[in-house]
UniProtKB/Swiss-Prot annotation:
Organism in which the protein naturally occurs: Escherichia coli (strain K12)
Biological process according to GO: alkanesulfonate catabolic process; cellular response to sulfur starvation; protein homotetramerization; response to heat
Record-given protein name: Alkanesulfonate monooxygenase
Biological role stated in the UniProt entry: Involved in desulfonation of aliphatic sulfonates.
Induction per the UniProt record: Repressed by sulfate or cysteine.
Gene3D superfamilies noted in UniProt: Luciferase-like domain (3.20.20.30)
Activity-pH dependence: Optimum pH is 9.1.
Phenotype for residue 298 to C: In strain: K12 / MC4100; inactive
Additional record remark: FMNH(2) which is absolutely required for this enzymatic reaction, is provided by SsuE.
NCBIfam families in alphabetical order: alk_sulf_monoox (TIGR03565), PRK00719.1 (NF001939)
Chemical reaction(s) catalysed: an alkanesulfonate + FMNH2 + O2 = an aldehyde + FMN + sulfite + H2O + 2 H(+)
Description of how the protein assembles with itself and partners: Homotetramer.
Length: 381
């Protein structure tokens, strides 16, 4: 099985160390462009662009990277409860058309009540997943060119439709990650690829089996991916030294503040990440070559594969043997580490190198009539 390898655009900051200004660098458009172009040339399938108040807007960043890349895909967040499904469907179709079919979408429900309240969302955990399920139903139907009437608990639309279709049919692929039962049920019923954070293989296997069984109950098969950091060097000793350097400027106060912030979220996945290290620096190798140091201060993906090329490749193949075909990777700083992974790791793996997509011809069309329909040629009698 060929593996799809993704990289990450650090729109929330980048540098040599975690939790400090020491060794940080400006993250401007030029720097993000360097990372995107490096990923494009090295053969990564795409890049994940993060979302939330700590990041630059993912959609604008993705759009700005389209003309400076050739084959790289952009995994961009859909935000149920923050954006209406009708607007999100139009945005998705536009991004897919502008990129010639290089758009992918990541369903993000949110987990921090404080941040969600700032965005005007006052739903609890279960309600957010209800809203996300309704959002996804409407979004998918619109991209399949249906005119949609929907009267749900959270989403209400009447006569919703999409005039300009996406390139990818029936709709651009939909990614999603969540560890709770309700999240897994949503994934099983509606998404194309289920993402998990980098837990030890035995825990990942358990998740995959649960989601696969739930999907089968809906008569569906879905793909699987994993989100991990990578610290790969020419030797194992060098890799572990780099891991220790990454957190060498962290103090206990910063760790405690970060863990307190994570504790207020209602994300089951974040709780599982925190439980891997319990906010402590000791015993951070939680599984062979799987290191939890990143999660001391970083929300979301908090583990890294650490080692030389053959060692990290072997660990990746262990996850692949569980059924994972997509690996969303990152490393600090992201420009240099994109090259290290591409040069030290890719030659040891069966990496699916994407081709440059051929331009997709679009049907000629006149201006929309009354903002309601696209004019068609009238048959001559």
């Amino acid at each position: 099985m060929s593996l799809n390898m993704f990289w990450f655009l650090p729109t929330h900051g980048d540098g040599h160390y975690l939790g400090t200004e020491e060794g940080s660098r400006p993250v401007d458009h030029g720097y993000l462009q360097q990372i995107a172009q490096a990923a494009d040339r090295l053969g990564y399938t795409g890049v994940l662009i993060p979302t939330g108040r700590s990041c630059e807007d993912a959609w604008l960043v993705a759009a700005s990277m389209i003309p400076v890349t050739q084959r790289l895909k952009f995994l961009v967040a859909l935000r149920p409860s923050v954006t209406s499904p009708t607007v999100a469907a139009r945005q998705a179709a536009t991004l897919d058309r502008l990129s010639n079919g290089r758009a992918l979408f990541n369903l993000v429900t949110g987990s921090d009540p404080q941040e969600l309240a700032g965005d005007g969302v006052f739903l609890d955990h279960s309600e957010r997943y209800e809203a996300s399920a309704e959002f996804t139903q409407v979004w998918r139907r619109l991209l399949q060119r249906e005119t949609v009437d929907f009267n749900g608990k959270h989403i209400h639309v009447r006569g919703a439709k999409l005039l300009f279709p996406a390139i990818q049919q029936p709709y651009p692929p939909l990614y999603f990650g969540g560890s709770s039962d309700v999240a897994q049920e949503l994934a099983a019923e509606q998404v194309d690829l289920y993402l998990t954070w980098g837990e030890p293989p035995e825990l990942v296997k358990e998740k995959i089996e649960q989601v696969r069984a739930k999907a089968a109950a809906h008569g569906r098969k879905i793909r699987f991916g994993i989100r991990l950091h990578v610290i790969v060097r020419e030797t194992n000793d060098e890799a572990w030294q780099a891991a220790e350097r990454l957190i060498s400027h962290l103090d206990d106060e910063t760790i405690a503040k970060a863990q307190a912030a994570f504790a207020r979220t209602d994300s089951v996945g974040q709780q599982r990440m925190a439980a891997l290290h319990n906010g402590k620096r000791d015993n951070l190798e939680i599984s062979p070559n799987l290191w939890a140091g990143v999660g001391l201060v970083r929300g979301g993906a908090g583990t890294a594969l650490v080692g030389d090329g053959p060692t990290v490749a072997a660990r990746i193949n262990e996850y692949a043997a569980l059924g994972i075909d997509s690996f969303v990777l990152s490393g600090y700083p992201h420009l240099e580490e994109a090259y290290r992974v591409g040069e030290l790791l890719f030659p040891l793996l069966d990496v699916a190198i994407p081709e440059i997509p051929q331009p997709q011809p679009l049907n000629p069309q006149g201006e929309a009539v009354a903002n309601d329909f696209i004019p068609r040629k009238v048959a001559q009698s």
